[in-house]
Amino acid sequence: MEKASGAQRERIGVVSGGASETAAKLVERAGKLNSERMVLTAPGDVRMAAAAAAVIAGESDPSVPVNGAVLAGFSGLSASYDDTPVDTRVTGGVTPLECVSGEVSIVRGITTRTTTGGAADKTWRELTTVRIVDDVIPALRASLRARFVRSTNTAQVRAAIRSQVMVELENKRAQEIIDSFGEVSVKASEDDPTVCLVEFSFAVAHGLNRIYLSAHITV
């Protein structure tokens, strides 16, 4: 997955947990994968992992979480989790599945990336985060590639590149794929005058996982 993504062919892989694996074993396996491009589902088998991959691939809006998405063709699971094991798995980088009324669905889409440099890191935990990045960056690449073929690396062209990047980011913001974006910087490389460097930042839109109600009742 990482090799393909490094070659600008962004991919996400889905693997299944063993039918009898404990929460500790699943979290340990997720920790060994520790990749924002790998998803570990449990309970279930490779068929359910494939169904989860189909759900992920079939969702056209990268900001929409797969939470609650039904895995077609399945009516039961080999095990069920209560809230505590579910939270343990989510925190540990495991995507839990559940069966309700004869339908198997994804509880919450999580990647196996839980640490960076050995320290706990939630940055890439949500599956929507990497999906949004995989939507925004290729879209910008394609837009710039289409509009600036055979261009010169002049101040005027760099200004046009900056404007185009801002247009694309504003489109993503309007689509609610990103929440916001920061300053866009475009400059010629000091090492190679034929190279244009574009830098920008953006905040991804977050999925809604839970709603907590606090009722203040007056009688």
Describe each region flagged by the PLM:
Residues 1-150, 161:
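A glycine- and small-residue-enriched flexible loop/hinge signal that marks low-structured segments
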Residues 4-6, 176-178, 190-192:
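A generic structural signal for short, solvent-exposed coil/turn residues
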Residues 8-11, 165, 208-211:
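Glycine-rich loops and low-complexity Gly/Arg-rich segments
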Residues 14, 136, 184-186, 198-200:
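Generic structural hydrophobic/aromatic packing signal, biased to beta-strands
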Residues 74, 181, 198:
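Anaerobic metallocofactor- and corrinoid-dependent redox/one-carbon enzyme cores
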Residues 137-185:
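Extended, compositionally biased non-globular segments
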Residues 188-219:
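C-terminal edge-of-domain segments
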